[in-house]
């Protein structure tokens, strides 16, 4: 049976940007959609050149995203938003109001109120809204989720997640910055947070995704260590986890958490972790076993037991299909052929596009995850400003 190829447009993501090309590669991974239009940059020359490099019809390369949505809404299947933070909400809102499904970079907005409004519009118009919390797309993260769900770890007591980078150790914020870094330090563009809104939301979403639990309260200590930096570049956050509400569980494809009433989480996110590159390391401790996953060795998942040898699960090994349908479906290449970040985002796009076609719930971060992540950011900022007091999420 011939499968219809979808058509999409992109706002932001000019040639030379970091995340735009990754989105395009991820979408091409399963060859389900074609880029047919775009508004790639505020810079007119960069916008035109990007369209040319991507072999687009010049008449479908727009100087303004509002013009793009007005002219293309009836011809597109979905819109991808890869712009700076302050424009996520207005672009996503306009696209949803025009009847377009949307895949929007994180953070979904600058405030909880904005994120909730996007959620209401998507629900009212029955549209699909996806967010690239990419680490939830890794096969072994899906295996971790399913092992927890099946009770392999027992009652979950403790979760430790660190997401550490050393990138800000290379930057002097007292001097003029290149475009890629300058906007992240401007509150009018990035919003009121840097590290929490940039990579902290990834860590938060991973914890809720893997455990199936919901963070109820947090205590945050935010710091700015890099000279000249106006926003947070380091965060230490404690969280208390519990079963999600029924409505939240339904929005997470019916996933219920591991049996736990008092689970605690410790989250460390930093951009001043000297020597680190992109260290995402997850540990989940239950009363029967624990697990460990490292994003820099993403094809392996370790499980430790009190009285048995440690087990290392390998992506695409023959036994994976029996343990986790999600991990099996997310594995693309034979065992021993490593998969990474682009493939993980490709998995999320595969599920997002399936939802666009079927109008059914699929396994990707959607409206619920986007709103939850913004509640996390606002709670962390509120806690830090109040002297690191426990704050409701």
Which sequence ranges carry the predicted segments?
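Intrinsic disorder/low-complexity segments
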Residues: 242-261
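Rossmann-fold dehydrogenase core element
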Residues: 117-135, 155-158
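C-terminal helix-rich "cap/oligomerization" subdomain common to oxidoreductases
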Residues: 1-5, 78-80, 337-340, 344-393
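Beta-loop-alpha module in the N-terminal Rossmann-like domain of NAD(P)-dependent dehydrogenases
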Residues: 56-121
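C-terminal glycine/acidic-rich active-site capping loop/insertion
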Residues: 257, 282, 288-364, 393
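Predominantly a Rossmann-like dinucleotide-binding segment in NAD(P)-dependent oxidoreductases
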Residues: 4, 15, 136-229, 301, ...
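N-terminal Rossmann-like dinucleotide-binding module
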Residues: 1-55
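Hydrophobic residues in well-ordered beta-strands that form the structural core
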Residues: 104, 129-131, 293
């Amino acid at each position: 049976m011939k499968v219809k190829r979808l058509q999409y447009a992109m706002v932001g993501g000019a040639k030379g940007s970091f995340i735009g090309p990754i989105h395009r590669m991820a979408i091409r991974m399963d060859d389900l959609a074609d880029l047919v239009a775009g508004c790639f940059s505020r810079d007119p020359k960069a916008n035109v050149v990007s369209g040319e490099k991507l072999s687009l019809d010049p008449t479908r390369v727009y100087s303004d995203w509002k013009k793009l949505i007005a002219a293309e809404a009836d011809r597109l299947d979905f819109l991808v938003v890869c712009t700076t933070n302050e424009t996520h909400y207005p672009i996503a809102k306009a696209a949803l109001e025009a009847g377009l499904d949307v895949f929007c970079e994180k953070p979904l907005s600058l405030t909880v109120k904005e994120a909730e409004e996007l959620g209401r519009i998507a629900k009212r118009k029955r549209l699909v809204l996806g967010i690239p919390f990419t680490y939830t797309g890794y096969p072994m993260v899906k295996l971790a989720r399913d092992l927890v769900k099946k009770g392999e770890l027992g009652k979950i007591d403790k979760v430790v997640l660190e997401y550490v980078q050393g990138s800000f150790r290379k930057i002097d914020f007292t001097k003029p910055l290149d475009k890629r870094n300058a906007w992240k330090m401007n509150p009018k563009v990035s919003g009121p947070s840097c590290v929490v809104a940039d990579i902290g939301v990834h860590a938060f979403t991973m914890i809720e995704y893997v455990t199936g639990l919901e963070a109820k309260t947090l205590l945050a200590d935010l710091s700015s260590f890099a000279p000249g930096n106006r926003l947070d570049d380091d965060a230490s956050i404690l969280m208390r986890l519990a079963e999600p509400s029924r409505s939240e569980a339904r929005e997470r494809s019916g996933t219920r958490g591991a049996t736990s009433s008092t689970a605690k989480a410790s989250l460390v996110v930093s951009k001043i972790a000297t020597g680190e590159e992109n260290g995402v390391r997850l540990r989940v401790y239950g009363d029967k076993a624990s697990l460990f996953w490292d994003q820099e060795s993403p094809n392996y998942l370790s499980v430790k037991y009190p009285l048995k040898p440690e087990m290392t699960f390998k992506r695409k090994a023959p036994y994976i299909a029996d343990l986790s349908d999600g991990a099996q479906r997310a594995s693309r290449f034979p065992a021993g052929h490593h998969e990474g970040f682009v493939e993980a985002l490709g998995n999320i796009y595969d599920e997002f596009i399936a939802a666009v076609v079927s109008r059914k719930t699929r396994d990707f971060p959607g409206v619920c995850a986007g709103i939850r992540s913004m509640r996390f950011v606002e709670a962390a900022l509120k806690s830090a400003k109040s002297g690191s007091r426990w704050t409701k999420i």
